[in-house]
Amino acid sequence: MTTSSDNLFCPEQNFYGPASKKIYVDGSLYPLKVGMRKITLSKTYTLQESSFSELPMYDTSGPYSDPSAKIDLQKGLPCIRDTWQTQQKETRPSNQSSHKPLNGRTPIRAAEGGSVTQMHLARKGIVTPEMEYVAIRENQMLEEWIERFSIGGNTFSPVTAEFVRDEVARGRAIIPANINHPELEPMVIGKNFRVKINANIGNSALGSSIQEEVEKAVWACRWGADTVMDLSTGSNIHQTREWILRNAPVPIGTVPIYQALEKVGGVAEELTWEIYRDTLLEQAEQGVDYFTIHSGILKDFLPVAARRMTGIVSRGGSIIAKWCRAHKRENFLYTHFDEICEILRAYDIAISIGDALRPGSIADANDEAQFAELKTLGDLTLKAWEYDVQVMIEGPGHVPLNLVAENMTRQLEYCHEAPFYTLGPLVTDIGAGYDHINSAIGGTLLASLGCAMLCYVTPKEHLGLPGKEDVREGVIVHKLAAHAADLAKGNPTAWLHDNIMSTARYSFAWEDQFNLSLDPVKARKWRKESSPEQGENIEEERFCTMCGPDFCSMKKSQEATE
């Protein structure tokens, strides 16, 4: 294992302070360097006969938090996967488009008729570098703690590369990792792993620039986004995505129908399969790791959706619905699904099968249209698996709290345990300005029941294009939701994080509390603002301004036992 020096890179983004160091954990099967953060604690904490003077943390920031890294956004991040791609021998140069990557690499694809997907290799019994990488990440160097930990009579085992392989082979987990995204630090999405979160970014016809979107993508990674979706619908969609990909250490997803629509001047009726196919190939060669494709909305579902309070709220779904009505034909993303899968398996692109008929209001939740489409998504999942294509299923939406659990039950039944990826769900329709909290409430419950990844919502949801601070708020709130779900599922590393935080709080170890929080910047700032007279001596205070020195329950509790 190698460790970087002091965390000085990008001081304005030095979120975690000098107690946090970037470290790299070596692989045992492959020449891997798996990035994590290590927090040095102010004291040693003893929990279940294990002692901790430092805590390794799961880290999504890539090289951006490494002071030794030489970051040049013009050139992109280092191509770390080039040295360990097992699929290389099964590939050939790709000439499907005129795309020229910023990093100068020649795009590659599977040999004619071949497959290079993680599922294909997993089903052949091969443990790939990506599988070992994500196993190391999930364990956070805490294998000994995981084996000792028990709760409610349940015991646990560390994640192994073989376990990851088996989950991917079964379709219960995916590793989104296009062979043309060599800058990627692989991660896993599945109900038997840490709950992940996705951050949406992207320009619109009314705002933002390439620079702003790249900055938002990096910002989201720094705050903890496990994946990022570029949902650009404005100008320069292709160039924006290229800059994001070359500087992204996390998987990047897109909705290709947006760029296809741009090519026909925004006129949905003029879309064709050929235009869409060419768009898939362009994005595949760029390195997009997963596509949201709305193949499950069928023309027979449209009359049912028309009776809803809020109709079709999916942008991609509304585009396809308009095309189907105009041409009086079936959705071409459904009729050409086999051809789509052939493209996906050639580049190892996962498919997020889109829920075009997700409810956009609680009145429409769990209705006939939503569940009819969900059954179709299950059928498409089986078809994609015939091609060894990795699949996750998109979910709602707006769902009142009492109907949330049914979504998970039906998804597991209809979609054969493929990972569930949901936008919330939002549990009320009146949260404008606070819909990130609204989303996190439903997301926490759904993730505790088995949802694998939560798509964040920002405070600007339903109101406008989010800026950097909105991205930060959305990421932090959904990290909180994901972590709460991990606790409910008994995740040992999540419980350790909470238990050390609680012990630090009881012992008034303020710096440890800041460093262990999801937003150390805000925690440190608000604590110091509440006691400005203490200055740098805040560690000596055994109370906060909420209760003061005479009414602090923890202080009194300690005094009572002395």
UniProtKB/Swiss-Prot annotation:
Zn(2+) binds at H398, H462. Its cofactor is [4Fe-4S] cluster. One of its GO terms (biological process) is thiamine diphosphate biosynthetic process. Belongs to the ThiC family. Catalyzes the synthesis of the hydroxymethylpyrimidine phosphate (HMP-P) moiety of thiamine from aminoimidazole ribotide (AIR) in a radical S-adenosyl-L-methionine (SAM)-dependent reaction. Transmembrane segments: none annotated. The keyword Cell inner membrane does not apply. Pfam families: ThiC-associated, ThiC_Rad_SAM. Keywords: 4Fe-4S, Iron, Iron-sulfur, Lyase, Metal-binding, S-adenosyl-L-methionine, Thiamine biosynthesis, Zinc. [4Fe-4S] cluster binds at C544, C547, C552. Residues 85-105 are annotated as: Disordered. This is Phosphomethylpyrimidine synthase. Binds 1 [4Fe-4S] cluster per subunit. The cluster is coordinated with 3 cysteines and an exchangeable S-adenosyl-L-methionine. NCBIfam families: PRK09284.1, PRK13352.1, thiC. Substrate binds at N200, M229, Y258, H294, S314, R315, G316, D355, A356, L357, R358, E394, Y421. Its EC number is 4.1.99.17. Residues 85-100 have a biased composition (Polar residues). GO terms for cellular component: cytosol. GO terms for molecular function: 4 iron, 4 sulfur cluster binding; carbon-carbon lyase activity; zinc ion binding. It catalyses: 5-amino-1-(5-phospho-beta-D-ribosyl)imidazole + S-adenosyl-L-methionine = 4-amino-2-methyl-5-(phosphooxymethyl)pyrimidine + CO + 5'-deoxyadenosine + formate + L-methionine + 3 H(+). Pathway: Cofactor biosynthesis; thiamine diphosphate biosynthesis.
